[in-house]
């Protein structure tokens, strides 16, 4: 569902249902805010639900966040992937997102929502990252699973060509483990299961 208070509509994107600027902000469209969607769910008798936050939008999300895994400062930097036609750029959305994240208000201004209603499912990821801007043989989806005490990483091929790439991750774990053993380093443990590669979840500093 589109969020009528999504940040891109403040920043100059057109309302997708009317094709006009600021319609959702002025109450002239059929989209809803997070609070309005929560009211619709509870009024329908659905008291168990989860919100997810596709980014940057719902058509071709690059990431999907959740209340258990919200974005960090500097992550929301792909804000001009607009599919509703022409738009204006009234301010730097990345900087505003960083301020919203710091203030704990990102969920209110997410451009769109994905809702799952019903008893909480333990198999749902808390975070999803799509790597589709690669050659097809390397296109994968990375999921972070589990609660804060039992995190796990799952890598899934999103194209037929990428199946072999995911299978090779186990091979390279073994190769690297041997190569760096004398240096006291070990590769992140990998397990192949149901067509996916599962890894330990490790905290560290990225060198990207």
Segments (PLM) and residue ranges:
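Conserved class I S-adenosyl-L-methionine
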Residues: 1-22
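Short alpha-helix
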Residues: 27-53
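Conserved catalytic loop of SAM-dependent methyltransferase domains
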Residues: 50-86
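Conserved Class I S-adenosyl-L-methionine
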Residues: 81-116
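Short hydrophobic/aromatic beta-strand or adjacent loop that forms the aromatic wall/cage
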Residues: 109-115, 136-141, 194-196
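ATP-binding glycine-rich loop module of kinase domains
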Residues: 125-174, 200
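Conserved kinase catalytic-core helix
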Residues: 171-184, 207-208
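Conserved structural core of kinase catalytic domains
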Residues: 185-208
């Amino acid at each position: 569902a589109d969020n009528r208070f999504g940040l891109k509509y403040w920043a100059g994107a057109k309302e997708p249902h009317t094709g006009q600027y600021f319609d959702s902000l002025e109450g002239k469209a059929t989209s809803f805010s997070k609070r309005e969607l929560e009211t619709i769910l509870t009024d329908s008798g659905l008291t168990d639900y989860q919100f997810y936050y596709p980014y940057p939008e719902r058509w071709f999300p690059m990431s999907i966040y959740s209340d258990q895994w919200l974005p960090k400062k500097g992550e929301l930097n792909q804000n001009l992937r607009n599919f509703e036609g022409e738009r204006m750029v009234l301010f730097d959305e990345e900087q505003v997102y960083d301020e919203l994240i710091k203030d704990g208000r990102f969920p209110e201004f997410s451009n769109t929502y994905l809702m799952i209603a019903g008893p909480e499912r333990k198999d749902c990821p808390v975070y999803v990252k799509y790597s589709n801007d690669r050659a097809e043989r390397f296109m994968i989806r990375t999921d972070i699973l589990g609660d804060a005490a039992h995190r796990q990483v799952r890598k899934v091929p999103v194209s037929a060509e990428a199946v072999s790439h995911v299978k090779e991750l186990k091979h390279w774990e073994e190769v690297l483990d041997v190569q760096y053993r004398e240096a006291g380093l070990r590769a992140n443990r990998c397990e192949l299961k149901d067509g996916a590669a599962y890894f330990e979840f490790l905290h560290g500093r990225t060198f990207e």
